């Protein structure tokens, strides 16, 4: 294992990103640089009761910040969670947000930061990522934001969007604004060492899904391609290590970086994995990373006729023998087996009762637009049923 101190550094892309073990100690200074004196730390209820959150709040207080805590967030955050967070922000007279946690906490916190100072009457759903909806919001009213991920998967800490569940319609909506991206990001591997192996695996596969779908998306974006393929190499090298040895700080740090790389790369686009994972998460309240991990080989198989060339290049970069889509799928299957990822959706309690509805929801999901093949609702239904039954 190499000297972990060599990973202590900073860069801008475009957020100011601080990496290294113990960098959470820099949080108060980063808040002050953004003009915060009374930040609201937003996280999920599971993390809120852990010592790490109290330690962060106490450290902020010792540095002169009046930091509050909001943790009323579901595993798949809802519009009601965001509204409650906005109320807490206003009632506590806060002036910034610390987004702390996994994808749920980060997404909810970013949405709160977006909405906290907007004009009265502006609906969160009016900012769904459709056309120029983002122009409905006042970008200058978005409050300062520092993101601190405690899982390595969603990459939401460097993203310009939040995925929020519309409970009334039972659908996940992507809320977007170009100024939602956090100004500061702290990637501290010590915050992730307590993750159980199953969560490490599921979130790590989520990072892989972002890189992989960005790699396969047909749009012209060479920078995203380069970031995506290097992100996948880091997943290959470091996810099994982080899974097997949770205290491996080098592996944990590199998975945090791979996660951020995935979310940076997918500005090129996502695809059918996410087009299916979003409705499945909304309908079954299932873990997003686990859904993408299970769906991955089935979507690659369905896209096979359109992704031959990028799969050959990917295999060569990852040193996979006999480059091609079949070999890439085999690599995914082998990785999933090492991480004890289930082979089918049925194994996590998802039945086929809503197959038609899932197909109809997937085909209109924003992620479907950048899939290499323009699947129909019936195509999505078939992919879902294959994944539900384990037919590859």
Labelled PLM ranges:
Residues 48-123, 240-252:
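N-terminal small/polar loop signature for handling phosphorylated ligands or for N-terminal nucleophile
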Residues 80-189:
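Glycine/threonine-rich beta-strand-loop-alpha-helix active-site module
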Residues 1-70, 391-392:
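An N-terminal, well-structured beta->alpha segment
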Residues 352-392:
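Short, amphipathic C-terminal "tail helix"
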Residues 283-354:
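Gly/Pro-rich interdomain helix-loop hinge
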């Amino acid at each position: 294992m190499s000297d972990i101190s060599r990973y202590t550094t900073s860069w801008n892309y475009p957020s100011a990103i601080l990496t290294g073990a113990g960098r959470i100690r820099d949080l108060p200074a980063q808040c002050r640089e953004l003009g915060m004196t009374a930040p609201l730390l937003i996280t999920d209820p599971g993390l809120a009761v852990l010592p790490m959150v109290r330690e962060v709040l106490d450290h902020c207080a010792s540095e002169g910040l009046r930091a509050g805590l909001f943790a009323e967030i579901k595993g798949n955050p809802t519009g009601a969670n965001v509204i409650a967070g906005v109320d807490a922000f206003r009632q506590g007279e806060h002036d910034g947000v610390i987004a702390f946690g996994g994808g749920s906490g980060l997404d909810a916190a970013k949405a709160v930061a977006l909405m906290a100072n907007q004009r009265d009457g502006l609906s969160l759903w009016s900012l769904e990522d459709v056309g120029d909806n983002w122009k409905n919001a006042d970008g200058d009213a978005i409050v300062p934001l520092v993101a601190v991920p405690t899982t390595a998967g969603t990459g939401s800490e460097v993203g310009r969007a939040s995925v929020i569940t519309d409970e009334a319609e039972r659908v996940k909506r992507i809320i977007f604004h170009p100024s939602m991206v956090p100004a500061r990001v702290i990637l501290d591997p010590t915050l992730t060492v307590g993750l159980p192996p199953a969560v490490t695996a599921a979130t790590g596969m989520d990072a892989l899904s972002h890189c992989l779908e960005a790699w396969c998306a047909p749009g012209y974006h060479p920078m995203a391609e380069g970031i995506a393929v290097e992100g996948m190499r880091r997943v290959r090298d470091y996810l099994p290590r982080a899974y097997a040895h949770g205290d491996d700080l080098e592996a944990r740090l590199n998975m945090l970086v791979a996660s951020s790389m995935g979310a940076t790369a997918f500005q090129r686009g996502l695809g059918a994995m996410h087009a299916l994972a979003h409705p499945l998460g909304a309908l079954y309240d299932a873990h997003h990373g686990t859904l993408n991990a299970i769906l991955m080989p089935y979507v690659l198989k369905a896209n096979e006729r359109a992704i031959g060339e990028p799969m050959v290049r990917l295999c060569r970069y990852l040193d996979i023998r006999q480059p091609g889509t079949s070999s890439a799928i085999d690599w995914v299957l082998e990785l999933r087996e090492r991480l004890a990822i289930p082979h089918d959706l049925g194994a996590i309690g998802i039945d086929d009762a809503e197959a038609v509805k899932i197909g109809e929801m997937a085909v209109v999901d924003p992620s479907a637009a950048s899939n290499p093949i323009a699947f129909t609702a019936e195509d999505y239904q078939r992919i879902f049923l294959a994944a539900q039954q384990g037919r590859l």
